[in-house]
Amino acid sequence: MVIFMELSEAIAKRTSVRFYEEREVNDETLKELIKAAIRAPTASGLENWFFVAYKSKDIREKVYELIKQGHIEYFTGRGLPEEKMKKLLKRFEEGMYRAPLYLGVFINKNVRALQGEKYNELEFYFALESAAMAIENLMLKAVELGLGTCYIGVTCFEHIEKELKRMADLGDEYFLVGLITVGYPREEPKPKRRRKSAEDVLKIL
């Protein structure tokens, strides 16, 4: 598989994709995504990330229901009006977030450089930062391969994370950073313009 794209083009094209074709993401493509992810910077060289591919049909259906459940819980907590909640549920009926591949991105909290309770928070942040950079690498590689992705944060609700770990037979030392939907976009992705410019978010000293 030889596909090349300018990095600036991949960055510009990356956007959250929520609707996918039924076409499978094969194992070769999956491995290309993970290879890109693990080239990310990693604090203390620990590489304490771990990826779970929820890929079989039955497993994907269970994950999809967890995503739906998480969104209902999230928007209920935000006080979403009933009419808007109905629209959200209609989008799920239309297949929103139903993907041929879900990637769980975890960190292993037991893999660390600094020992001792006083460093727990710092080491946790280091691991999160490493995983976040790996996720961006993965997403940009996905653009190059003609795939779409979306970061699903609601799966980090404790009861949903627990179920995702149970499905993957992972112990308490693992922490879910996020779930990524992966697939071929149903429609041509249309990246949105950012509300803030580089000048708005930059301070030069």
Which positions does each model-derived feature cover?
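Short acidic N-proximal helix/loop "leader" segments that mark the beginning
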Residues: 2-24, 28-32
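C-terminal helix-cap and adjacent tail motif
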Residues: 9-10, 15-17, 175-205
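Short Asp/Glu-rich motifs
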Residues: 29, 56, 63, 161-163
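Small-aliphatic-rich amphipathic alpha-helix that forms the alpha element of a beta-alpha
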Residues: 32-33, 37-38, 103, 109, ...
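Glycine-rich phosphate/pyrophosphate-binding beta-alpha loops
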Residues: 41-45
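Short connector loops at helix/strand junctions that flank enzyme active sites
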Residues: 46-48, 96-101, 175
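Glycine/small-residue-rich phosphate/adenosyl-binding loop
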Residues: 53-131
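Short, conserved aromatic-histidine micro-motifs
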Residues: 70, 161-181
